[in-house]
């Protein structure tokens, strides 16, 4: 009886310990967020790795829609109106789908953010689409990587790197006059807060 109680105790301890961990994923999820203009941009994606394979043109075929990552489709979120690839996009959440070719990629922002991979991709749900040139790199990027570069108050580039391939997706603010008004209002609020602090002192 004591042995049974002991074994149950050990099992309970193991279960409790295991709840603090998760099984290592082949394509772990990553979320990146960049403060931009008066809000922020967030990308949520799975990170597959090369692992000695030929990626573009083989694992990811040319001319076919790709989920831009692994597992659930990659998503991007905007908290203000922007232009992506020169095209206006309302604030909200979008799935990113890509049709890669050797020298250029077609980038699509799609309304179906719950899609698992590209299996249920519906072009009727597209918000915008545009093409960007492919840049070949010398250094191997082992795991798929999204990042933000060339950041200013009005523009930034979303960078996608994998294997020996890189693309740059330009993002800029839309409705500049509205954004300028928001900035002025924020400045007024900050000044009001400083004035209050001065009175308290």
Label the predicted regions.
Residues 68-121:
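Mid-length scaffold segments of soluble, non-membrane domains
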Residues 19-61, 118-201:
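Primarily secretory-pathway and cell-envelope proteins
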Residues 1-21:
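Bacterial Sec-dependent N-terminal signal peptides
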Residues 57-73:
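Aromatic- and Gly/Pro-rich amphipathic surface segment
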């Amino acid at each position: 009886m004591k042995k049974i109680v002991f074994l149950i105790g050990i099992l309970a301890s193991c279960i409790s310990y295991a709840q603090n961990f998760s099984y290592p994923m082949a394509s772990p999820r990553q979320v990146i967020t960049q403060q931009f203009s008066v809000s922020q941009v967030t990308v949520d994606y799975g990170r597959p790795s090369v692992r000695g394979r030929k990626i573009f043109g083989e694992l990811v075929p040319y001319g076919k829609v790709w989920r831009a990552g692994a597992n659930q489709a990659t998503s991007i979120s905007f908290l203000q109106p922007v232009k992506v690839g020169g095209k206006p996009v309302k604030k909200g959440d979008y799935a990113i789908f890509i049709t890669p070719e050797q020298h250029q990629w077609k980038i699509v922002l799609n309304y179906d953010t719950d899609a698992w991979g590209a299996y249920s991709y519906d072009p009727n749900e597209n918000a915008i689409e545009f093409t960007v040139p492919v840049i070949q790199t010398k250094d191997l990027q082992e795991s798929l990587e999204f990042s933000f570069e060339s950041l200013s108050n009005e523009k930034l580039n979303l960078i996608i790197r994998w294997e020996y391939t890189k693309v740059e997706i330009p993002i800029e603010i839309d409705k500049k006059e509205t954004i300028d008004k928001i900035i002025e209002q924020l400045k007024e609020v900050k000044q009001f807060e400083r004035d209050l602090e001065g009175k308290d002192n």
